[in-house]
């Protein structure tokens, strides 16, 4: 454990309290943190090294080096170094600024003060000076300086409360408690200074919810777990003081261990652009070779005789060597086909798009003051190409606000409402709820409409009392009183809050807890139970239990959990009650309610003592501790007596149905990945409109092994494609072209809508290598896919499967810690700021408060970003090919001498001054249709999914367009200058006038072209386009003026040329002719295309223009209700760890789903919906609505 290799050799950590000398021999990290990358001395070399690792920067650096060689450079060094230095400087300033703030943050944290026990005295020390093994005193509302073993606190039994918002985003308080042997130390400094315990524990890791260790002190060993540890980043709350021993410091703390780098994501356009840039480099080399060969031929055939003004010694250099030098010269001249400004412009545009998302008030959730946040600036255009959405349910599609609705106790349902004829009826506003106002500590917002439960409580039904007693005892809720004396519950899951609140209103009030006791008020009587054991929840157990001793001395085990798990633990005598309760659970799940089973067991005192002794031994074990504890839990949680079941409601979020429908019309497939049971998952599908009664079939895959799963998948495919048509070949399509062909086959083959439901157990087999192809083929042919009972790992595996084999852009959206792996795996990760903390938000690329904002994020911001980026790239490549290839044509008329056409300053400023701002304005602000029409017509989204706006074909069209423009730019002026004289009779066919004419023509042509490309004009577009032209002429006349020539005669030799040339009418005629010849074919083509073959976007633009002239009153969409048959389902899923229980069971009400945004459930047809939307009483709109074959 010594020297630099200690991390590799450390297998366990040994820490001795109050002994720095002992701990220093292990060379543990100190408490100083470093998140900064540079210092004053290392910034320049490290930053330059990082920047030149980028291929583009390294490429331009190589060009700069070539330009420093006089024999091959026709351009001076500043033509490359000016833009390169500009880019390098901008990036360096940005990196330096970011690192300055990191330094500032590091210093602020490292210089925080803590009271440290040194030499038997408490001394104020900076955090960075704290060492492993030190004992620290914390006071209320202080941040925790390092990962501490809690020794004692001001609260009884060594309890303390911490807020972990900086770790996991959760603002609710969590309880930690010290060992009883150390809690006795209290605040006695002398006893704390004499504490010399030795902790042997796990090595530093990033697991926030797990800790294993042993404290050896006074000849005895004590087991340590996560409840004894306070982590760095926590804040001490509601506790006057506490003392802790430093276990991990600085970079070894769990907070810093979790601050690893996020996986870098690149867009499909980035990957395509990298490929195209390589192609351009190849094209550039080919041009260089052609011109080099031309130079060699010219030198050998013409150069030797070309001696009128040039004199050199014969045989001084060979034609081949001349061609070699010319090759490199033209590589330098033609490098502007990929200017360095391209990469800077792309980042600026993406930054602008990110700000638009952050500033969008329509994605601002005013109830909680939560705006939409683009947490990355590199993925915006990818939002316009999404094909698959993978969504969590609870807290994402639903509100994750739980309400206790129904329960089954001893075979009887409570919570139903009956009429005078004892017939079950709907709950209406006229129905009076149970009056809880007489109970002073009741929750005023709680409502329950069945009065029979209160009657059973008053009559003293023992089963009802035991049921409510269990709800008040078996949980992880913390209680406190506010300033008004009201009882407040700190809950870690909304489910537990709903159950404990229900028990509270029915007279069984949870009051307080300590590590050894739980106090509740039972119908007015205060009762304290001794807490003997807490059997925590995890994803395998799917249940939690507490073992308590009541005042009469009886030992009880109370348990709640998933019915499938708990029913297996029941005593055989429960058979009749089990049947009744199962029926009730099916009924609850059919109504979309989240369910839990409730059971208990009476324990013999002798048996419990023997079991508890084994549990203590297992907790003290250093090997296989978890396995031994799990076995003991299984042993005691058996022969349970069933009490009943609970049913909690979780409503859909506002706007979910409309959003799902709209995204489906945009050809986006939504897969729900939930921890719910199968029936509940089906129910949420119906509630969200993803499943309908009109579907041809819903395939349910529930095989118990790989063979059964494979057979079910293949049988489903046979049903889908037909018995006599063997479509599948067992292979998954990977290329986009093949995928489009596959889609066309499916359209011909599948005549209806299908859905796939698969549970987690079957999914585990379906994800095996020999079955996953069948799963993926079937799933991708279905309109809806719902995976239920899935683990966080399976969620990520499903996303990776589609990413890898479908070549499709994926998006994952969720709100909880169990969604983090899925969010990180997808191309785009979206976090919902919900009830389950901020883990998902912190791991996401984009975040907002409501699922409905996903519609605007994709259909508006995503589509616009893709549209703008594609137009930007098309124009940028066109502009630079038109600009650069003029040199190629000129080479044939200048003896392939690598002479440039333009002035060197024009070459330097063309991309960074003359044409940079207009294209940026278009890339940031342009839009084809308004945001409202983007939402109302989801089919506008499809071009992005099919990569229609920028692909290899579009690139070649841009290249050909640029080549044509370069031909016009060169040959029209060349032909005009071939034999021409000015108005004064003087010959004007000089090189300088020719260069000025071509440069002016180029600036005007590309400005006119961007004006034609701009669909949405703003004040900024006008200023940038006309301003750029004005800047060009201002700089041109300045550089050609007598004044600048007098100061820099060598750099600006074209004195007076601009004034002389641009005062000639024939020059302006040439410029006009060049401009018209360049843009008229484009104007003609676009006019014919829009008139004869309009896209959907073209038609919507026509409609927008017509709407400005005649704006008819908007009509509301028809509202319909769907009645559905009862579908049963249960829900249960938790996050692992103490107190994070019952947080991902997922249900929804299937009958009469609640209104969302004024729309309960609307049946849309993709064609008729768009037609109805766009029929607006004008001829243009009428023709649009009648055109049912929309060309994308």
From Swiss-Prot:
PANTHER family: PHOSPHOLIPID-TRANSPORTING ATPASE IM-RELATED, PROBABLE PHOSPHOLIPID-TRANSPORTING ATPASE. It is an enzyme of class 7 (translocase). Ubiquitously expressed at moderate levels. This is Probable phospholipid-transporting ATPase IM. Residues 1104-1130, 1143-1163 are annotated as: Disordered. Residues 1-44, 93-276, 350-871, 925-954, 1014-1019, 1086-1192 are cytoplasmic. It is a multi-pass membrane protein. ATP binds at residues 392-394, 496, 537, 560, 594, 674-676, 789, 795, 818-819. Belongs to the cation transport ATPase (P-type) (TC 3.A.3) family. Type IV subfamily. Its cofactor is Mg(2+). The lineage of its organism: Eukaryota, Metazoa, Chordata, Craniata, Vertebrata. Residues 1104-1125 have a biased composition (Basic residues). Coiled coil: none annotated. One of its GO terms (cellular component) is Golgi apparatus. Component of a P4-ATPase flippase complex which catalyzes the hydrolysis of ATP coupled to the transport of aminophospholipids from the outer to the inner leaflet of various membranes and ensures the maintenance of asymmetric distribution of phospholipids. Phospholipid translocation also seems to be implicated in vesicle formation and in uptake of lipid signaling molecules. Keywords: ATP-binding, Cell membrane, Golgi apparatus, Lipid transport, Magnesium, Membrane, Metal-binding, Nucleotide-binding, Translocase, Transmembrane, Transmembrane helix, Transport. It is found in: Cell membrane; Golgi apparatus. The active site is at residue 392.
């Amino acid at each position: 454990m010594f020297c630099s290799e200690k991390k590799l050799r450390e297998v366990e950590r040994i820490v001795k309290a109050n002994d720095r000398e002992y701990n220093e021999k292990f060379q543990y990290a100190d408490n100083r943190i470093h998140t900064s990358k540079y210092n004053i001395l290392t910034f320049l070399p490290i930053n330059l090294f990082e920047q030149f690792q980028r291929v583009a920067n390294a490429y331009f650096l190589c060009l700069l080096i070539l330009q420093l060689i006089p024999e091959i450079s026709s351009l001076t060094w500043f033509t490359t170094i000016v833009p390169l230095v500009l880019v390098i400087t901008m990036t360096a300033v940005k990196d330096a600024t970011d690192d300055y703030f990191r330094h500032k943050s590091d210093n602020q944290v490292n210089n925080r003060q803590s009271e440290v026990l040194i030499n038997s005295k408490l001394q104020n020390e900076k955090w960075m000076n704290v060492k492993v093994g030190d004992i620290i005193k914390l006071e209320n509302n202080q941040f925790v300086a390092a990962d501490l073993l809690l020794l004692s606190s001001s609260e009884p039994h060594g309890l303390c409360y911490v807020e972990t918002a900086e770790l996991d985003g959760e603002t609710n308080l969590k309880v930690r408690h010290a060992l009883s042997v150390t809690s006795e130390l209290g605040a006695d400094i002398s006893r704390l200074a004499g504490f010399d315990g030795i902790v042997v524990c796990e090595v530093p890791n990033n697991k926030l919810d797990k800790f294993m260790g042993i404290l050896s002190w006074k000849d005895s060993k004590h087991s340590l777990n996560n409840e004894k540890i306070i982590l760095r980043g926590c804040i001490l709350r509601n506790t006057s003081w506490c003392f802790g021993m430093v276990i991990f410091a600085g970079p070894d703390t769990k907070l810093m261990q979790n601050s690893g780098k996020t996986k870098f994501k690149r867009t499909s356009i980035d990957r395509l652009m990298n490929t195209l840039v390589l192609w351009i480099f190849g094209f550039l080399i080919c041009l260089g070779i052609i011109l080099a060969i031309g130079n060699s031929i010219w030198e050998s055939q013409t150069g030797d005789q070309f001696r009128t003004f040039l004199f050199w010694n014969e045989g001084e250099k060979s034609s081949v060597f001349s061609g070699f030098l010319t090759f490199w010269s033209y590589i330098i001249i033609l490098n502007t086909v990929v200017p360095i400004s391209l990469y800077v412009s792309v980042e600026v545009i993406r930054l602008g798009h990110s700000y638009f998302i952050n500033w969008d008030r329509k994605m601002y959730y005013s109830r909680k003051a939560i705006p939409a946040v683009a947490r990355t600036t590199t993925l915006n255009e990818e939002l316009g190409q999404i094909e698959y959405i993978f969504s969590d349910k609870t807290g994402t599609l639903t509100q994750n606000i739980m309400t206790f609705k129904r329960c089954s106790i001893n075979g009887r349902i409570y919570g139903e409402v009956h009429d005078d004829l004892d017939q079950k009826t709907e709950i209406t506003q006229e129905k009076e709820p149970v009056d809880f106002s007489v109970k002073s500590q009741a929750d005023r917002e709680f409502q329950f409409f069945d009065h029979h439960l209160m009657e059973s409580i008053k009559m003293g039904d023992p089963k009802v009392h035991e049921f409510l007693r269990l709800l008040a005892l078996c949980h992880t809720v913390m209680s406190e009183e506010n300033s008004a004396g009201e009882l407040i519950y700190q809950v870690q899951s909304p489910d537990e809050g709903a159950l404990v609140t229900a028990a509270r209103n029915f007279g069984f009030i949870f009051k307080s807890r300590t590590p050894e006791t739980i106090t509740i008020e039972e119908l007015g009587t205060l009762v304290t139970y001794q807490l003997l054991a807490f059997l925590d929840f995890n994803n395998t157990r799917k249940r939690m239990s507490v073992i308590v001793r009541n005042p009469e001395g009886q030992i009880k085990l109370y348990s709640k959990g998933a019915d499938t798990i708990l029913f297996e633990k029941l005593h055989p005598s429960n058979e009749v009650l089990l049947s009744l309760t199962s029926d009730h659970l099916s009924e609850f799940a059919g109504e979309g309610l989240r369910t839990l089973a409730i059971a208990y067991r009476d324990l013999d005192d002798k048996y419990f003592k023997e079991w508890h002794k084994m549990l203590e031994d297992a907790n003290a074990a250093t090997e296989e501790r978890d396995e031994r504890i799990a076995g003991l839990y299984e042993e005691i949680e058996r022969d349970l007596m069933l009490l009943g079941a609970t049913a909690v409601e979780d409503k859909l979020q506002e706007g979910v149905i409309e959003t799902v429908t709209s995204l489906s019309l945009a050809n986006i497939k939504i897969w729900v990945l939930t921890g719910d049971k199968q029936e509940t998952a089906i129910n949420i599908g119906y509630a969200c409109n993803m499943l309908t009664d009109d579907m041809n079939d819903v395939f349910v895959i529930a095989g118990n092994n790989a063979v059964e799963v494979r057979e079910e998948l293949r049988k489903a495919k046979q049903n889908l494609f037909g018995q006599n048509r063997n479509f599948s070949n067992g292979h998954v399509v990977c290329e986009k072209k093949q995928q489009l062909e596959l889609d066309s086959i499916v359209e011909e083959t599948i005549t209806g809508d299908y859905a796939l439901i698969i549970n987690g157990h079957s999914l585990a087999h379906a994800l095996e290598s020999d079955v996953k192809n069948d799963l993926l083929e079937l799933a991708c042919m279905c309109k809806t896919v719902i995976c239920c009972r899935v683990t966080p790992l399976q969620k990520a595996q499903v996303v990776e499967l589609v990413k890898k084999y479908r070549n499709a852009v994926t998006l994952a959206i969720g709100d909880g810690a169990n969604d983090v792996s899925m969010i990180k795996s997808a191309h785009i990760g979206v976090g919902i700021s919900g009830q389950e903390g901020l883990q998902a938000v912190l791991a996401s690329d984009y975040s907002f408060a409501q699922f409905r904002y996903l519609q605007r994020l994709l259909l508006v911001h995503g589509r616009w970003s893709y549209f703008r980026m594609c137009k930007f790239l098309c124009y940028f490549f066109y502009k630079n090919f038109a600009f650069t290839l003029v040199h190629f044509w000129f080479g044939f008329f200048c003896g392939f001498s690598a002479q440039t056409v333009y002035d060197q300053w024009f070459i330097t400023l063309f991309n960074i001054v003359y044409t940079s701002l207009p294209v940026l304005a278009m890339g940031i602000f342009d839009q084809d249709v308004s945001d409202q029409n983007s939402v109302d017509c989801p089919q506008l989204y499809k071009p992005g999914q099919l990569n229609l706006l920028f692909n290899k074909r579009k690139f070649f069209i841009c290249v050909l367009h640029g080549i044509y423009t370069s031909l016009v730019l060169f040959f029209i002026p060349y032909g005009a200058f071939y034999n021409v004289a000015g108005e004064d009779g003087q010959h004007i066919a000089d090189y300088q006038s020719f260069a000025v004419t071509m440069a002016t023509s180029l600036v005007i042509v590309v400005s006119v072209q961007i004006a034609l490309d701009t669909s949405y004009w703003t004040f900024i577009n006008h200023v940038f386009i006309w301003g750029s032209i004005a800047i060009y002429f201002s700089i041109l006349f300045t550089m050609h003026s007598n004044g600048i020539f007098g100061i820099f005669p060598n750099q600006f030799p074209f004195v007076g040329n601009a004034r002389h040339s641009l005062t000639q009418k024939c020059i302006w005629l040439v410029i006009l002719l060049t401009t018209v010849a360049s843009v008229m074919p484009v104007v003609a083509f676009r006019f014919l295309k829009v008139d004869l073959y309009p896209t959907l976007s073209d038609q919507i633009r026509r409609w927008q223009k017509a709407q400005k002239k005649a704006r008819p009153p908007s009509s509301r969409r028809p509202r319909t209700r769907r009645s559905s048959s009862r579908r049963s389902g249960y829900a249960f899923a938790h996050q692992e760890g103490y107190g994070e229980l019952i947080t991902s069971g997922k249900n929804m009400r299937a009958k009469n789903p609640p209104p969302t945004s004024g729309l309960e459930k609307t049946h849309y047809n993709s064609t008729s919906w768009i037609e109805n939307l766009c029929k607006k009483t004008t001829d243009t709109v009428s023709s649009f609505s009648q055109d049912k074959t929309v060309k994308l």
